[in-house]
Amino acid sequence: MSAGRTGRTGRTGRTGKDIVGAHRGAPDVIGADHGPPFVQPGPDPSNPLHVQPIQFVGSFPDPQVRLEPELPEIALIGRSNVGKSSLLNVLVGRPGLARVSGSPGKTTLLNFYRLPEFYLVDLPGYGFARAGKGARAGYRKLVNDYLRTRTSLAGVVWLLDIRHQPSTDDLEMQRLLAESGRPVLAVLTKADKLTRSALPVRLHELSEALGLQQDQVEITSSHSKTGIVELATSIVAAAAGENV
C-alpha cells in the first residue's frame, strides 16, 4: 500500500450481542467479549487469514467508536455491488461471515471484524444510484471522518470492478483517499467475468485511468479465488506496518 496514492457520541449499532454501558457524550468502548465466539480457521493454510480465528465485533454508526483491545485496522471500501462482502468472506475463509446485502446502498454502518493482531473494517458501499442527496452527504461525512480521524487505521483496500472504467463516484473516492494520506491498495474484483487474455489489458487500462503503476493494483476473484492469497498476504503486511 502506498500512502495517499489513489491519486463521540454514545450511539451504538448492531453487534453479535447487545452493547451495554454506552455513555452519553463519550465514544463506545467495545471489548472482545461483546461479540460471538471466534470463528475457527478455514481450510487453506497458504492463506495467512485462514489460519487465524476471526470474530464479528459489531456494526456502528460512529467513526470514533473505541474498541478494546485497540489494534491496527485495515478498511475495505468500494462501490455498492463491487463484491465487497463476498470478497471478505473468501479472504478469511468464512462463508456467510459478512452478509451479502439484498439492498445495496442501504447500509450506513461500519462493520468491525477482529483477528488476533488487527481489525478488518467493512465500510458501507458508495455510489448507489437511488441514494438521495441527504444519504450521499451522510455517507461522505461518515467515510471522510473515518478516513481522516481514525488513529488506528493502518491502510485501505479500495475495490473496483475490473469490467468497468472508474465512475464519477470512484474518482471522488480516489480524491478522498488521497486527501486522507492513508496507505491505499487498489484491488480489482470479479476477474472471473473476463477471459484470461483480457485481464492484463484491463489491468493496464484501469491502472492508467487511475494514475497508478500496475504493481500498485491487485486482481482478484471471489469465485475463482484468483489473487486471494496474495491480497490476504498484503493485508497482513499492511496491518503490521509494512509498505506493500
Each language-model region and where it sits:
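Small-residue-biased low-complexity repeat regions
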Residues: S2-G16, G21, G25, G31, ...
